[in-house]
């Protein structure tokens, strides 16, 4: 090897190796101090790209796990509100069962309906005010997508439904609505109710006053109706004529009548104090004037004495040919029982409903007047109409009864099958709660899976970019030794040109 001064090849070689060991030492120290094998792309370009993708995935999945927890929180918030709605519905159902019991008074039903209304209003309040982070969860139908992955489309959808009184089918729910009015309701709920029921017996029409029961004819100018004392038939006559008995008349009978001749003959043939029978009546001879048959006879009718006077006798050789007869009282035969009476008429009794029924009268519609308005009731009295519209009894806020027509009642009517309506609402709430419960379990599963994935990805990234301390410490020790050796050798290499000077001595 040539001996030169200008170029110290050994020094240059030593310096180069010293630089290499310095670079190795710097790299080892950097890795040991950062804990990373890859601190820049130059350390491992491919590894750095792979590790960076892992980092993106890990951060995305970590955030996705937090998102899933938010999803659980949303579901729990919504389910908690639904639990309160369920509690209110259960109370409404309990009250509805109570309301359907027939023992409740009007005030009871009003109190029950008042609480039901408050419960329904609370359901609407919960629906309108329940929110999560400013998002209302029950006031409208909504699909909320929760990002549970690191990439597009990796979502779980929470199906939020509008849950309020209307959506539950309970809008206008009422257990104390107006009920169809009946004649009985009108009589019991209002004062000064008047009117009449109509009846028909053949071609004849009648009215029966709903308060007094008085029966009159169904006409513009009605007549009072009576029951014929003789035959029980309906009539407008207040009495029936009894039959006058010819034997007992206060006016003188025409001379020669059979009754006068018979009585005169009895007097003629008897003496005072004698009795005799004539036409089923027992007479006593009170006075006898002469032998011609003039005189007086008497009998007792209904506890009263009746005297017959016989006069104007015309006799033949053996018989009375003519006479006049005059009674002290007029006597009649009753049309009812054929008995003697002093009354020329028998009074007919005023007709009653039972008399109409006895004459096979058929009930028709009724006319009922309440507060000046005339309503029509059907034959059974369970339907009241005005101008063709069915009437209902309603209660004002102060509890006063009032009549409203079917149009007004439609908006306030009692709910048909209230328990079925509540059960349907409960089923809908249960379905939504069930869905939310299932989605919470799904989020729990997603969170567990995300945690496992993040753990595995961290392990994979660690294997790529984390420093192996055993290796790096070994590399650092090696580089330090090389540095020390290189420094020492460089000093010796720098002394080599001094050897050339020895040749010049």
From Swiss-Prot:
Keyword terms of this UniProt record: Bacterial flagellum, Secreted
Main location: secreted
Location within or outside the cell: Secreted; Bacterial flagellum
Function: Flagellin is the subunit protein which polymerizes to form the filaments of bacterial flagella.
UniProt xrefs under Pfam families: Flagellin_C, Flagellin_N, FliC-like_3rd
GO MF: structural molecule activity
Assigned GO CC terms: bacterial-type flagellum; extracellular region
Family: Belongs to the bacterial flagellin family.
Record field: transmembrane: none
PANTHER family for the chain: FLAGELLIN
Record's protein name: Flagellin
Misc. comment: Individual Salmonella serotypes usually alternate between the production of 2 antigenic forms of flagella, termed phase 1 and phase 2, each specified by separate structural genes.
Biological source species: Salmonella moscow
Recorded name of the encoding gene: fliC
SUPFAM superfamilies for this protein: Phase 1 flagellin
């Amino acid at each position: 090897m040539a001996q030169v001064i200008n170029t110290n090849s050994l020094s240059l070689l030593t310096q180069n190796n010293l630089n290499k060991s310095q670079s190795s030492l710097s790299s080892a120290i950097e890795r040991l101090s950062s804990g990373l094998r890859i601190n820049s792309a130059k350390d491992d370009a491919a590894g750095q790209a792979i590790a960076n993708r892992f980092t993106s995935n890990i951060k995305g999945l970590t955030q996705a796990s937090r998102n899933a927890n938010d999803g659980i929180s949303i579901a729990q918030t919504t389910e908690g509100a639904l639990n309160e709605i369920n509690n209110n519905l259960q109370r409404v159902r309990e009250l509805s069962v109570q309301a359907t019991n027939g023992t409740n008074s009007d005030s009871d039903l009003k109190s029950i309906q008042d609480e039901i209304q408050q419960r329904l209003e609370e359901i609407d309040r919960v629906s309108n005010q329940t929110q999560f982070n400013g998002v209302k969860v029950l006031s409208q139908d909504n699909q909320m997508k929760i990002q549970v992955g690191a990439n597009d489309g990796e979502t779980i959808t929470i199906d939020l439904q509008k849950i309020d009184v209307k959506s539950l089918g309970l809008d206008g729910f009422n257990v104390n609505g107006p009920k169809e009015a009946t004649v009985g309701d009108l009589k019991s709920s209002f004062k000064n109710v008047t009117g009449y029921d109509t009846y028909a017996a053949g071609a004849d029409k009648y009215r029966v006053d709903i308060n007094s029961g008085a029966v009159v004819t169904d006409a513009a100018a009605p007549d009072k109706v009576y029951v014929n004392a003789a035959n029980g038939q309906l009539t407008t006559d207040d009495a029936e004529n009894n039959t006058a008995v010819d034997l007992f008349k206060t006016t003188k009978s025409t001379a020669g009548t059979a009754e006068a001749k018979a009585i005169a003959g009895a007097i003629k043939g008897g003496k005072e104090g004698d009795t005799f029978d004539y036409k089923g009546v027992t007479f006593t001879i009170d006075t006898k004037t002469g032998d011609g048959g003039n005189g007086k006879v008497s009998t007792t009718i209904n506890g009263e004495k009746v005297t017959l006077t016989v006069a104007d006798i015309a006799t033949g050789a053996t018989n009375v040919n003519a006479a006049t007869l005059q009674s002290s009282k007029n006597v009649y035969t009753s049309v009812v029982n054929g008995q003697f009476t002093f009354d020329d008429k028998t009074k007919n009794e005023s007709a009653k409903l039972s008399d109409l029924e006895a004459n096979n009268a058929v009930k028709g519609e009724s006319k009922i007047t309440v507060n000046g308005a005339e309503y029509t009731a059907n034959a059974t009295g369970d339907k009241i109409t005005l101008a063709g519209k069915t009437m209902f009894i309603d209660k004002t806020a102060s509890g006063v009864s009032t009549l409203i027509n079917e149009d007004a009642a439609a908006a306030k009517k009692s709910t048909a099958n209230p328990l079925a309506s509540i059960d349907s609402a409960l089923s809908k709430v249960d379905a939504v709660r069930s869905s939310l419960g299932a989605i919470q379990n799904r989020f729990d599963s997603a969170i567990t899976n995300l945690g496992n994935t993040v753990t595995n990805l961290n392990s994979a990234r660690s294997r790529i970019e984390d420093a192996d301390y055993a290796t790096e410490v070994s590399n650092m020790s090696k580089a330090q030794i090389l540095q020390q050796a290189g420094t020492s050798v460089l000093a010796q290499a720098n002394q080599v040109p001094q050897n050339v000077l020895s040749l010049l001595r």
